[in-house]
């Protein structure tokens, strides 16, 4: 076991699966599947497996999604890496085909397709047209499509393994802001379930739920609140669809207070669904959500950081909810 970054952990898992599955393919544009890590060998999928299996398509997200979907329908395990989530050209394929064909064929069509979409938004100074990309709930609205967003290198490796081995299509959201995050990750393959949330800290005063890019700020806030004497139960959704309702309900039944934190937009953010599900199952609980405002991100880095939820925002909301 060694300290590994988010993307190194993912490519290490993909490399192993491609060695086991001789027809598995990886499709990409712009960003070659190469990763290095201190004390570990460089991973270069294109060099190891050749261009027949690791294909640089050029800048054409629709073609990438279509080729991935077609390969999966032909029985080939396929993964594509789309480096800008805001490029929504593949959306109609995900909406009208990827999520439905397995059901439309009575379950006969296997769909081992994984779509890695990089969440490149919420970056100070990129301005509205290049930062408007924390649109995670777009994909969780699509029936038949699983949507996951790991927040740690350990979960990223385990969940990409589960996604590749799943016969259903999976959207695998990659929070680009976490690219430099590293932690101990096993060298061997392992699976992290695609339908289970993770309880990061246990507590009895307040439940805080986040996912993907919001989790570092959630954990900072949870630690600060602990120093103030507040016992926080911090939950990482990991999966946006299916949502682990049981873990959420069990926590809020104990704390009776729920705060959700999202880097995506306030209206219809993942936290809205979390609150709705808990409210249907827990009586007498109090709720609050914080998220990025429903406004285009400004070009000013200072204003952008002021708008984006951070640990201070989480702490203030938690104090108000508990107090």
Describe the role of every protein-language-model region:
Residues 1-169, 173, 178, 306, ...:
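Thiamine diphosphate
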């Amino acid at each position: 076991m060694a300290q590994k970054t988010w993307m190194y952990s993912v490519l290490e898992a993909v490399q192993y699966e491609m060695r086991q599955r001789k027809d598995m393919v990886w499709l990409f544009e712009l960003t070659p599947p190469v990763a290095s890590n201190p004390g570990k060998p460089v991973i270069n999928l294109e060099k190891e497996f050749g261009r027949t299996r690791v294909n640089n398509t050029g800048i054409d997200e629709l073609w990438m999604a279509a080729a991935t979907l077609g390969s999966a329908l032909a029985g080939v395990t396929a993964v594509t890496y789309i480096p800008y989530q805001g490029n929504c050209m593949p959306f109609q394929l995900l909406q009208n085909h990827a999520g439905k064909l397995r059901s439309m064929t009575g379950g006969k069509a296997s769909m081992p397709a994984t779509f890695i979409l990089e969440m490149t938004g919420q970056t100070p100074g990129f301005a509205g047209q290049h930062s408007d990309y924390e649109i995670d709930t777009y994909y969780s609205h699509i029936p038949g499509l699983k949507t996951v967003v790991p927040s740690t290198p350990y979960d990223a490796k385990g969940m990409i393994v589960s996604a590749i081995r799943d016969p259903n299509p999976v959207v695998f959201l990659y929070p680009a802001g976490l690219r430099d995050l590293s932690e101990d990750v096993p060298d061997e393959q392992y699976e992290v379930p695609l339908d289970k949330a993770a309880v990061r800290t246990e507590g009895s005063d307040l439940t805080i739920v986040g996912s993907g890019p919001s989790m570092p700020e959630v954990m900072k806030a949870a630690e600060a609140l602990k120093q103030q004497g507040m016992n926080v139960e911090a939950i990482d959704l990991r999966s946006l669809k299916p949502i682990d309702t049981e873990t959420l309900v069990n926590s809020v039944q104990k704390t009776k207070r729920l705060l959700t934190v999202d880097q995506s937009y306030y209206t219809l953010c993942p936290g809205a669904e979390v609150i709705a599900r808990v409210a249907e199952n827990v009586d007498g609980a109090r709720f609050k959500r914080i998220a990025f405002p429903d406004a285009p991100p400004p070009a000013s880095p200072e204003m952008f950081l002021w708008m984006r939820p951070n640990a201070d925002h989480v702490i203030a909301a938690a104090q108000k909810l508990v107090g």
